[in-house]
Amino acid sequence: KVFEQSKEKNRNLNTKTDLKDYVMDVLLKKEYSQNNFGNIEAGVGTNDRWQVRGFDGYMKGSVNASAYANLNNVNQSSVPGSDGSFWDSDSPKSIMNTKKVGVSTIAEKTGGTFYVSTDLAAQWQGVDLDEQKKQISILPQTNINKIFQNLNDSRNSSFSLNNKITKMGISYFQFQTMVDYGRSKNDDLNKYALFDKNIPSNSSVLQLFDAIDEGGRNAFDYLQNYSINKANNRAHNFRLRENIEMSQALAWGDDLIFHADASYSDNNQKLGENSHITYYLPVNDSIVSYVANDNTKTKSYSYTLEGFYHFN
């Protein structure tokens, strides 16, 4: 509503003694302007550490959209523009390479009666570990020495989709689809050798293992035992979920409500292990081997149907 301007005396004294004359009604129309904002950061550190992350937001009328990316090797898996959690101890002995990207959109019909929202996210992670150690005189007053090496190669990736359609009003309807997919692999190699004399101090762990692999006891006549353990893990998982919610306002004021939910999952995991130990002393060339393989597949289904009558 629009009124005549207050008199100067009332404005100066901040009083409302004079009644203002009514002029007219005005219908205000909401106008939207286009907005776009973004941020990008990059950094490097010691030990070849680096990170690049950024996000961008877009708003125009009834559409909001955003995108983000986080690329690094500092064990960081947050969503730029959303959260900033930092896990610095996930892989304390190695470097975790992470690539994480995503897109989110929300579309709204004028008047706020119809919405469509979509979230997409993908992530890749990898860990490489090469740990080598040489230990001399592991027992007091002895010449027992050992060397070991641990190699680990781990990779995993994931993809997720969440799409939601919502209709508001006297009748309410919401349909939601959720999809999750992931793959992972993990390879471990562990080597261990025990000697009953001092090992060459000028040879690296890798050089010592290479000599054992080529010559065995011929390379070191004081080699007691040598073990190799290999393990691998392969897995993938898939999950699909559909959810429907509906409600209808009845003419006499009550509500009729319906809900349906269905999900399907498919998981597959393969495990393999191969151990080989050779005892050179005191029993010459006594070999113990162990092999194990396991393949597990699971599929599951579930569904729910519900109906309600709500008295108002």
List the predicted regions and their residue ranges.
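Primarily recognizes Gram-negative and organellar outer-membrane beta-barrels
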Residues: 4-48, 62-312
